From Swiss-Prot:
Name of the molecule in the record: 2,3,4,5-tetrahydropyridine-2,6-dicarboxylate N-acetyltransferase
EC number: 2.3.1.89
PROSITE patterns: HEXAPEP_TRANSFERASES (PS00101)
Family: Belongs to the transferase hexapeptide repeat family. DapH subfamily.
HAMAP family recorded: DapH
Amino acid sequence: MSYNLTDPYEIARYIKEAKKSTPIKAYIEGELSNCDFTNIEKFNSGDLYILFGESEEILVIIEKNKDKIKNCRIEQDRRKSAIPLLDMLKINARIEPGAIIRDKVIIGENSVIMMGAVINIGAEIGEGTMVDMNAVVGARGKLGKNVHLGAGAVVAGVLEPPSSDPCTIEDNVLIGANAVILEGIKIGKGSVVAAGSIVTTDVPENVVVAGAPAKIIKEVDVKTKDKTKLLDDLRK
């Protein structure tokens, strides 16, 4: 089955039709040598077992063998999840603990994803861009190169309410902490969005906007560039 993940309705269909998963980890002390571990990843030494698999399969084993189990601990971090997390092993970027990045996301070279950041399906993070702590990039949100998305800022997605046009943040844009970029908005190259702003209309290149709703307050000048410059050392 193929899906056009540039269409919000197709993304919703993909999520609807995806096999939902409730994976768990079980740490068990007991006599389970006669159990059927088909479809379960098992590691054991003697009576100590570590099991990885779907909850309904592992829980059946635990219930059927409860008289043979001395101790059991279960860890779970999701329920009926439709989209797996991104495989980050081969990505050349700095991704800190606690960042949540769903599958089918593009992460550019030398970008930085900080603790607590959330990046949804179909989003694109450009080369050298930083997504700061607790910032959110919604479905199909597009961040260009050398963007700084401040702590707690939100780039809205296309899913709910559905929008055919994703948010587009062009190169060298700085978005301050807790700013909100609404659905389908485009921020032009080199512009600055002040902290706490709510951006409801497109922003041209090389301007500073502030307020709720955000309005242009000036053009980017030398002083603005000095106050908003990025640190290359954070991206190495």
